[in-house]
Amino acid sequence: MIQQQGWSAVNIRSVAAACGVSVGSIYNYFDSKAELMGAVVESVWHEIFHRPEDESMFQDTQTCIAWIYERMEYGCKQYPGFFTLHSLGFMQEEKSDGKRRMQRTWQHILDELCSVLKRDTKIRADAFTEQFTAETFADVLFSLMLSALLRQDYNPGAVLEIIRRTLYEKAD
């Protein structure tokens, strides 16, 4: 529905019609349009970043980041306006369920980035310290990812170079 008619087409009545059920049936699951939209946003995030069967891209930080940026570009093409519209709409306080769902999805992405950083055998032994942890670097990578989403810039080149210089190369 979103891909064909856009975000504005999503409401309780249109979802009920598309599913061939009564409006009341939809209200059994969602109390409001905001709650419905929160579930839709969460579903789209999961579809965009669904973990592939080939796990090899999660063994290496650079390969993982390249995959994430490819998926961001895919998401932008499949769901035009998703990244900007949902970010603006769900940061409003009255949409706390949508905000909670978005934060849960973002936390999942952050956790996966941390796992990849901890598994990556190519990372120098001294790359992380007590002050500069894998979690800290995952936060930086995630911030760069969000910035790229808002700018619709899906070229990971600069981020991959930052990773290479920060984690893999020995400083002189």
Segments predicted by a language model, with ranges:
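Short helix-capping/turn signature of helix-turn-helix
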Residues: F30, H86-E94, S147
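Short, hydrophobic secondary-structure boundary micro-motifs
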Residues: N11, F49, G81-H86, A125-T129
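Amphipathic alpha-helical packing segments from all-alpha helical-bundle domains
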Residues: K77-G81, L85, E94-I123, F132-E135, ...
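Short alpha-helical scaffolding segments that buttress acidic/His motifs in well-ordered protein cores
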Residues: L85-H86, L141-M145, I163
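Hydrophobic alpha-helical connector segments
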Residues: A39, E53-Q78, A134-A138, L160
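Helical hydrophobic small-molecule/effector-binding pocket
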Residues: Q62-L88, L150-Y154, D172
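Helix-turn-helix
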Residues: M1-E35, A39
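Short, basic, alpha-helical segments at the C-terminal edge of helix-turn-helix-like DNA-binding modules
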Residues: E42-F49
